[in-house]
Amino acid sequence: VVAAVEVDPIHAAIHKFNFPKCAVFPKSITGLSGEEIRKRAGLGNRTVDVVAGGAPCQGFSLIGQRALDDPRNSLVREFVRIVTELDASYFVFENVKGLTLGKHKKFLEEIIEAFELLGYYVRMPWRVLNASFYSVPQDRERLFLIGAKRGLPLPEYPEPTTIPAGSAQQLLNLPLGPSCKDAIGDLPDAEEFGELIHTDSA
C-alpha cells in the first residue's frame, strides 16, 4: 500500500503507525487529485495497480433524478474520479449490502455504468461477501465490485476459504475459521495498564 486517504485523523494516525512507508492523507478525498497522490507517494509515472475503497452512500434515486448526482453521494463520485485520474489498472469498491436491495439497486447500476463509460469492465454479477468465510472472526457482509481496464484480465471474486467459527455443520469441506477468542484471547488485559488512562503508550 503506497497511499491511503482517511478523513478521521485518529484512524489516519493508526494507519500511518501500522504502515510507516505509506503516504497517508488525513483529509477528505474531495479536492484531492490523482496528481497530488502520485507526487506525495513518490509514484511518478509508474502504473497504479489497484485503487481500493468504500464510500458512504446516503442519498438514493428520486423520480427523475440520478442517485449518482445526489450531493449526499459525492464520495462515490470522488472514488470513480480518483480511479480514473490515477489511471489504475484495477479497482475494488466495497459498500454495504443494502446497496443491492430494492430502490438502492438502481444506484449500484449507476456506479457500474459510470465505470464502464470510463473504460472499465466490472466483474458481474457483483458479489456480497462475508468476512467470516475468509478467516476473519467477524460476521460482516459487504458488497464488492471488482473492475479492470479494458484489455486487462478481469479477476474473479474470491471463493470462501473457511466457514464461520461455531458453525454447527461442515460446509463446503472447508476448515473452521478463527473465533474472537482465537484472534485476541492472548492479548493482555487493558485494565492491567493504568497508564493507558492518560497516555497512548504503555
What are these regions, as identified by a protein language model?
Residues 2, 49, 89:
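Conserved acidic residues
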Residues 5, 27, 53, 93-94:
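Active-site flanking residues adjacent to catalytic metal/cofactor-binding acidic residues
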Residues 35-45, 55, 62-202:
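Class I S-adenosyl-L-methionine
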Residues 49-52, 57:
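A short SAM/SAH-binding and catalytic strip from SAM-dependent methyltransferases
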